[in-house]
Design a protein with these regions (language model features):
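Conserved ATP-binding TGD loop and adjacent catalytic N/P-domain core of P-type ATPases
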Residues: 388, 420-564, 572
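Actuator/coupling domain of P-type ATPases
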Residues: 19-21, 26, 33-119, 131-138, ...
Length: 614
C-alpha cells in the first residue's frame, strides 16, 4: 500500500509539472507525461500483457491500458495519465478497505501463537507450536498466548477468550480446566499437559476455516463474475465499432473525435466498482461477524442467512444448557443409593449428557471391573451387566421394548427408568435448564421476520411443550430419534417458499446429519468443539442463541450493501456510457464514472464491517 501511495504522489507531481508549467519544449512536456504514465500505469500495462499471453484478454487491466494508450495516440496526454492515476487511487482505496476488512480476521489471525514454552527437565525451551507433541508439558506465562489445547495441571489464572468468542469477560481456569489455543493468559502462570497437536488444535481449525471462507462465493458474487465475463468483451467490441463506423457513415465526422468517444466509453465500461466492491462487502460481513464471535464459512452462507424463513433448533445444549441435574430418585424395592449406583455404573461408558448427570450425582468412583456387556440402543437407553445382573436404564421406549411394567405418572422432566433382570426397580427424574438468552433469541428472530421457529427434541412431549411455551416457539416435535430429526426437517422444507432458506441450530455433537441437510447448519458452542467447527456452515463460538439473530442482521446489512453497489455502479455506468457514445461527456467524466464510482462503492462496502450496534 505504501509503495502504491508513493507511486501516486510522484506520478501526480510529474503530471502537475507537465500540465502547469508552460514549457516551450513540446518534446520535454510529452516526455514528462510519458514518465508520469510509466510511474502510475506501468504495472497495469505489464499485467495486461501478461494476461493476454495467458489467454485472459478482457479484464480491467486491458481496458485501462487500451484506453490510456489510445489517448496518447490521439494527443490527449493529460487524460491518458489521469485515467491511470485515478485508477491507482481507486486501487489504493480498495487495498485500504480490504486491509481494514481483514483486521477483524487479522485479530483472529493474531490468535496464532508464535512459540510454546515446553518443560524439559528443569528448563523451559521455546519451540515452534508445530513441534510440540501430545503429552508434552507446557508453561504459559502472564500475557502469553496459549499455544496448544491442553489441560491445566498446575496453577490458576484468568484467560481472555475475546479473540475467539467476541466476549470481553475473562474466564477463570484452575487445575483440571481445559484450555484452548488462541486465548491469552492474563495474570497467573499455568502449567498444562498438551492434549492435541497444533495441526488439530482449536486455533488451527479456526484459522483454516477463516482462510478458506472467501473461496465459497455468494450468488451476488457469482452474478458479478459471469456479468464481467460477458460484459467486458461486449463493450470492447462496441468501442471498436464506435471508433470506426460513425466516421465512415456520418458526414463531417472525424476519426479523432470518435476515437476519443470510444476511449472514454472504454474507461467508463471498466467493471472495477462491481468486481471490487461486491466481494469486499461480503468479506467485510464475514469480518464483522467474526468480531461478534461468529465464524461464517463462506459468502454463500452469509447471503443464505438473509433469506432464512424457518429456524429449527435442537433443544439440548442449544436452547437449554445441556447440564442435566438429578432432581428426584424414586426406588422400588431397593434403596436410593443402590438405584443410583446401578444406574451410574450401567451408564458409565455413554457420552450422553444424561449419563454425565447420573455419574455426577453418584459422586463416587466408577469401578469398571464390575461392568461388562454394554449395549447402547440409540433413542432408547443402555443395557449393561453390573455385578452379574442385567441392568436396563433408559426411557419408556426401552421399557416397552423389554416388556417391563413401569411408572406411568405425569412428571415434568426427563424420566430415567431402571430395571434389573427384567424387574422394574424405580426411576430417576432429571431436568435441564433453559439458557438465559434463549427467549430473547426467539423474540429477536421473530422481529427479524423469521416465519417459523421450531424445536426438535428426543424428550417427551410434556418437557418439549413446556420449553416451547416458555420460549414462545411456534412448533415443537418431541420424542424423536436421531433419524426422525432428518425426516422432520424434510417436512419443514415443504413449508418454506422457493427462495426461502431453512437453518438448523444444534450443538454440533450429535447433529451432523441434520446440520448437513439444512440449507444453513449453525453450530453453537464452537469454542472447544471440533465437531461443531467441522460439521456446520456457521459456527457460534459461545453458547448464546441470541447471536443467531445478530448474525442474520449482519447478513441482511451485507446483502443490502452489495445490492446498493450493484444498482449504483451499473446505473451510473449505463448513463455515462450513453453520454460518452453521443460525445456529451469528456474523458474526465469517464474517469469519475469509473474511479469515482469505484471509490464510493468501496467506501459503502466498508460499512459491512461496522457491526457495533447490531
Amino acid at each position: 500500500m505504501t509503495k502504491r501511495l508513493w507511486r501516486i504522489i510522484i506520478g501526480a507531481a510529474v503530471l502537475a509539472t507537465a500540465v502547469l508549467l508552460s514549457l516551450n519544449n513540446e518534446w520535454l512536456q510529452i516526455a514528462l507525461f510519458i514518465i508520469s504514465y510509466i510511474i502510475v500505469g506501468g504495472d497495469v500495462v505489464k499485467r495486461a500483457v501478461k494476461n493476454i499471453f495467458k489467454g485472459q484478454v478482457f479484464d480491467e487491466n486491458f481496458l485501462m491500458s487500451i484506453a490510456t494508450i489510445g489517448a496518447f495516440f490521439i494527443g490527449e496526454y493529460p487524460e491518458g495519465v489521469a485515467v491511470m492515476l485515478f485508477y491507482q487511487v481507486g486501487e489504493l482505496f480498495q487495498s485500504y478497505a480490504v486491509g481494514k476488512s481483514r483486521k477483524s480476521i487479522a485479530s483472529l489471525m493474531d490468535i496464532r501463537p508464535d512459540y510454546a514454552n515446553v518443560k524439559k527437565g528443569d528448563e523451559l525451551v521455546k519451540v515452534d507450536p508445530d513441534e510440540v507433541q501430545i503429552g508434552d508439558i507446557i508453561v504459559i506465562k502472564a500475557g502469553e498466548k496459549i499455544p496448544l489445547d491442553g489441560k491445566v495441571i498446575e496453577g490458576s489464572s484468568m484467560i481472555d477468550t475475546s479473540a475467539l468468542t467476541g466476549e470481553s469477560v475473562p474466564r477463570e481456569v484452575e487445575v483440571g480446566s481445559d484450555i484452548l489455543s488462541g486465548c491469552i493468559n492474563i495474570n497467573g502462570v499455568i502449567t498444562a499437559e498438551v492434549t492435541k497437536e497444533f495441526g488439530e488444535s482449536t486455533v488451527s481449525k479456526i484459522l483454516d476455516l477463516v482462510e478458506n471462507a472467501s473461496s465459497k462465493k455468494s450468488n451476488s458474487e457469482q452474478f458479478i463474475t459471469k456479468f464481467a465475463r460477458y460484459y467486458t468483451p461486449v463493450v470492447v467490441i462496441i468501442a471498436v465499432f464506435l471508433a470506426i463506423i460513425p466516421p465512415l457513415v456520418i458526414d463531417g465526422a472525424t476519426f479523432s473525435d470518435w476515437i476519443y468517444r470510444a476511449l472514454a466509453f472504454l474507461v467508463v465500461s471498466c467493471p472495477c466498482a462491481l468486481v471490487i466492491s461486491i466481494p469486499l462487502s461480503f468479506f467485510g460481513g464475514i469480518g464483522g461477524a467474526s468480531k461478534k464471535g461468529v465464524l461464517v464459512k463462506g459468502s454463500n452462507y452469509l447471503e443464505a442467512l438473509a433469506e432464512t424463513e424457518i429456524v429449527v433448533f435442537d433443544k439440548t445444549g442449544t436452547l437449554t444448557k445441556g447440564v442435566f441435574n438429578v432432581q428426584e430418585i424414586h426406588p422400588e424395592g431397593v434403596s436410593k443409593e443402590e438405584l443410583l449406583e446401578l444406574t451410574a455404573h450401567a451408564e458409565s461408558y455413554s457420552n450422553h449428557p444424561i449419563s454425565f448427570s447420573l455419574r455426577r450425582a453418584y459422586r463416587k468412583e466408577i469401578d469398571n471391573g464390575r461392568i461388562s456387556d454394554i449395549e447402547e440402543i440409540s433413542g432408547h437407553g443402555v443395557i449393561a451387566t453390573v455385578d452379574g445382573k442385567k441392568v436396563m436404564v433408559g426411557n419408556i421406549k426401552l421399557m416397552k421394548m423389554m416388556d417391563i411394567p413401569y411408572f406411568k405418572g405425569e412428571l415434568i422432566g426427563t424420566i430415567v427408568h431402571v430395571a434389573v433382570n427384567n424387574k422394574y426397580i424405580g426411576y430417576i427424574v432429571i431436568a435441564d435448564e433453559v439458557k438465559e438468552d434463549s427467549a430473547q433469541a426467539i423474540k429477536e428472530l421473530k422481529a427479524a421476520n423469521i416465519k417459523q421457529t421450531v424445536m426438535l427434541t428426543g424428550d417427551n412431549k410434556s418437557i418439549g411443550s413446556k420449553v416451547a411455551k416458555e420460549l414462545g416457539l411456534d412448533k415443537v416435535y418431541a420424542e424423536l430419534l436421531p433419524a426422525d430429526k432428518v425426516e422432520k426437517l424434510e417436512e419443514l422444507f415443504s413449508q418454506k417458499s422457493k427462495k426461502g432458506k431453512l437453518a438448523f441450530v444444534g450443538d454440533g455433537i450429535n447433529d451432523a446429519p441434520v446440520l448437513a441437510r439444512a440449507d444453513i447448519g449453525i453450530a453453537m458452542g464452537g469454542l472447544g468443539s471440533d465437531a461443531a467447527i467441522e460439521a456446520a456452515d456457521v459456527v457460534i463460538m459461545t453458547d448464546e442463541p441470541s447471536k443467531i439473530a445478530t448474525t442474520m442482521k449482519i447478513s441482511k446489512k451485507t446483502l443490502k450493501i452489495a445490492h446498493q453497489n450493484i444498482v449504483f455502479a451499473i446505473g451510473i455506468k449505463i448513463i455515462v456510457l450513453i453520454l460518452s457514445a453521443f460525445g456529451i461527456t469528456t474523458m474526465w467524466a469517464a474517469i469519475f464514472a469509473d474511479v469515482g464510482v469505484t471509490i464510493i462503492a468501496v467506501l459503502n462496502a466498508f460499512r459491512a464491517l461496522n457491526v457495533k450496534n447490531l
